[in-house]
Each structure stands twice: as C-alpha cells, then as structure tokens.
C-alpha cells in the first residue's frame, strides 16, 4: 500500500495531511490533493514537494479513474464533490485514521493515549528507537525535535 499507487488526498492542506502527502510521495506514490484554503507552513511544504494543488477548491475532475484510492481529511464534508465522485466511480476511500490503521496492519504498534503528555512520551520513544538504530514508523501530534515530519509510514 505504500508505493506505486495513485493517491488523491482531499483536504491536503492540514498539518498532518500535508505531511502524509509528502511522505507518500517520497515512498514512490503519485500523489495529488485538493483543499479550499492552505496556510503556512503547509503551503510552502507542498510547493517545495510539487504537491500544491493547481487550483484551490474541490473539483470533480481531480478524481480520475486511474486513482488507486482517496484519503479524506477530517474536514472533508459528506457533500464534497470529490468525495461524491470517488464514491460514484467506486474508488476506495479511506479516512485518515482508516488509512493509518490499514498501513500498520502488519506492524507492531505502540499507542500513547491520555489527556496530557502524549507528544512528549511519543517523542521520547522515537528518540530511544532512533538512538538504537531501530527502524520505525510514527504518527505524532506535534513536531518532535530531530524529526522533520509528524508522520513517517
């Protein structure tokens, strides 16, 4: 699921979604995306990685039959024209959490939950794994020092 796919991300401008798009592209996928508003630093990061949408907004022509699947961001509404077009064309659709779960189906998971300290604890675990040269994927709510992204899958 991680390489050689044609993927469209609806609501690509979010902090997590744009990092996901960049990560998927670096893994060898063809990635496109759409959003109605994109702010910094997402805007610069998407442009730097040639992932910034050609025009802002949601357009049914963004959903082509050669897509392997579509990933939706948390702000994607059920009446979104791209989402409706993907459904009509029977293109598999994953929400962000569904995609992360599917991406980690065959992996050991460490999940940090709670009200406070999740990013800090996750960051500590990431640094321990990195220091011990253990390969790992991660999804973290904020930026951890020494890591360029909040997601690597």
Where are these regions (language model features)?
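Phosphate-binding loop of NTP-binding sites
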Residues: 4, 23-26, 47, 61-65, ...
């Amino acid at each position: 699921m991680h390489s050689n796919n044609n993927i469209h991300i609806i609501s690509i401008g979010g902090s997590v979604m744009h990092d996901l798009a960049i990560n998927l592209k670096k893994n060898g996928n063809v990635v496109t995306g759409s959003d109605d508003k994109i702010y910094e630093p997402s805007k610069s990061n998407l442009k730097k990685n040639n992932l910034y949408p050609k025009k802002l907004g949601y357009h049914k022509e963004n959903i082509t039959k050669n897509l392997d699947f579509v990933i939706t961001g948390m702000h994607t509404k059920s009446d979104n024209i791209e989402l409706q077009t993907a459904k009509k064309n029977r293109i598999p659709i994953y929400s962000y959490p569904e995609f992360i779960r599917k991406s980690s189906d065959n992996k050991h998971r460490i999940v940090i939950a709670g009200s406070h300290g999740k990013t800090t604890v996750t960051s500590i675990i990431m640094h321990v794994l990195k220091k011990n040269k253990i390969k790992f994927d991660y999804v973290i709510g904020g930026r951890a020092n020494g890591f360029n992204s909040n997601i690597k899958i």
